[in-house]
Each structure stands twice: as structure tokens, then as C-alpha cells.
A protein has these predicted regions:
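Non-catalytic alpha-helical scaffolds and adjoining flexible linkers that form interface surfaces
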Residues: 10-267
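Short polybasic linear motifs
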Residues: 1-4
């Protein structure tokens, strides 16, 4: 007679290991914390670290925001909250933490991932992009450009991107002037301007920059030249697009807007 063992672990849990970035965390009762991670192998996920506040030596990481870690966890089958048993730091990005503007950019990256990416939906492109951008952010002198590139690439990889390669309404190829519709999520050709009377004119150079960034690798995009006019318009359109579709302004974006190098461009 053959028997099948279904639950050798409590609550039908399996032991898993993965790389993660810390999106956010909060206290749970007096001894534990709950952390939202973005992982390479499982996408966005939540884990509880029991006893970390009373016995911090149990874990080899303090799980700072946007830090890169290896974790071992018990994956629960019928719950979205998993039990983390081991956590080892890979990179705390200390160089980023020495600059308030860079901390703001890294925080916005994590908040954007948390808002856009669905729970436990694997997307290695987003994970690899985020870790690459954090490493570059640590050494760059141009964090605002890196943030712009990240937003465009992130939206493209997530499937949440605005439509820049043709008219979002009729599908026609756009060769001349166009407008951008936040409500429809993309460009409108001159024949479709009436579809959204609140759409705004957009420079051809801005459209070309977005398409270049979507098409090319992050490292290649670092060499892309953007004049102040295009950079200004990109910030306006990307931020307004996110605000419209998320129905709020991200908290980290509000902080960045208060810093001189990230002041919101005026229309």
C-alpha cells in the first residue's frame, strides 16, 4: 500500500530561497516585522520575520529600504504572508544613503514597484532593472536622469506603459505633430485630438527619447542626450500619467518635488 505525505511542514509550506529588494516594512506586534519585498523568482511578496526586534542577531540584515538581500522563507500555499527564516545582506547601497536626493530616487523606485507590480507575479526584467539602476545610482552625478530612464523602462516592462509608437485611438502612425492624452494613455494624431480635449501638445524630441529608452538597454540609455526642454516635458508627462492612473501622487515624488534638482516643471 502506498501513502502520500501531504504536509510535512506546518500549513503546507515549502522552503524557498530568492533574491529580494526591500520595498517597505512595518512593525508587527512587539517582536516582529512584516516586509514587502520585490523578488527575482516570485515577484512582489510579503514576509514576516518573527522575533527580529528582540533577537536581531537571528538575521544577518537589518532590512533597510531598497537594500538587496538573499532570503530563505517558508512559502505558504494558502496565504500571501510567508515566514522568513533567514536573511543575508548582499548590498545595502551605502553610497546612495549619503545623498538625500539619491535616497529620494531609490525610495520612489521602490514605491513605484510596489504600486504597479501585482502580488506574486514573477518579472525578472523589473527585478534586474531595479538592481542595475540602484548600482548606477550609487555612483552617478545625475540621479534625475536615472529616475526618468527607470520610470520609462519600468512602465514598459510592467505592461503599464503609455502608448508612444502610434495613435492610441485609431492606431495610425504619427509622422507630424501629436498630443498626449493622459486619460487614454498615449499619443493622439491630429485626426483624433477631439477624442480628449484635455490632451497636451508634445515635442517630437520627447517622443523620440521615450522610444529610444524603451528600445535600448539601460546602460546605453545613460549616454542619451536630453536637452532641458525635453527633460522638463518628460518629467511633466511621466508624473502626470502616473498620478492620473494611480489616482494619487506618490509620497516619494512629493518629497523629490521639494528638492531643488527635482522641482516640478511649470507649464
Amino acid at each position: 500500500m502506498r501513502f502520500t505525505l501531504y504536509a510535512t511542514l506546518p500549513y503546507q509550506m515549502s522552503i524557498q530561497k530568492t533574491e529580494v529588494l526591500v520595498l517597505n516594512k512595518w512593525d508587527f506586534r512587539e517582536t516582529s516585522i512584516i516586509v514587502n519585498f520585490y523578488s527575482r523568482d516570485f515577484g512582489k511578496m510579503s514576509g514576516i520575520l518573527k522575533g527580529i526586534k528582540t533577537e536581531p542577531a537571528k538575521f544577518a540584515s537589518t532590512l533597510e529600504l531598497f537594500s538587496h538581500n538573499d532570503i530563505v522563507f517558508y512559502k505558504k500555499i494558502n496565504s500571501a504572508l510567508h515566514l522568513v527564516s533567514q536573511c543575508d545582506i548582499k548590498d545595502n547601497f551605502n553610497m546612495i544613503r549619503q545623498s538625500i536626493s539619491k535616497v529620494g530616487v531609490a525610495s520612489l523606485m521602490m514605491e513605484l514597484i510596489d504600486e504597479i507590480m501585482p502580488q506574486e507575479d514573477k518579472n525578472e526584467e523589473v527585478f534586474d532593472l531595479a538592481t542595475t539602476v540602484l548600482r548606477e545610482l550609487a555612483i552617478t552625478d545625475n540621479p534625475d536622469k536615472i529616475m526618468t530612464i527607470f520610470k520609462i523602462k519600468m512602465l514598459a516592462f510592467s505592461g503599464f506603459k503609455p502608448h508612444f509608437d502610434s495613435c492610441v485611438s485609431c492606431g495610425a502612425r504619427i509622422n507630424g505633430h501629436s498630443k498626449f492624452s493622459f486619460a487614454l494613455g498615449g499619443l493622439l494624431c491630429s485626426g483624433c485630438y477631439h477624442k480628449d480635449l484635455k490632451s497636451r501638445t508634445i515635442f517630437r524630441g520627447t517622443v523620440a527619447s521615450v522610444l529610444h529608452i524603451e528600445k535600448n538597454d539601460f546602460k546605453v540609455n545613460l549616454n542619451l542626450g536630453m536637452n532641458p526642454q525635453i527633460k522638463k516635458e518628460l518629467n511633466i508627462i511621466l508624473n502626470a500619467f502616473l498620478n492620473f492612473h494611480l489616482e494619487k501622487e506618490l509620497k516619494s515624488q512629493k518629497v523629490l518635488n521639494k528638492l531643488d534638482n527635482f522641482a516640478p516643471a511649470l507649464r
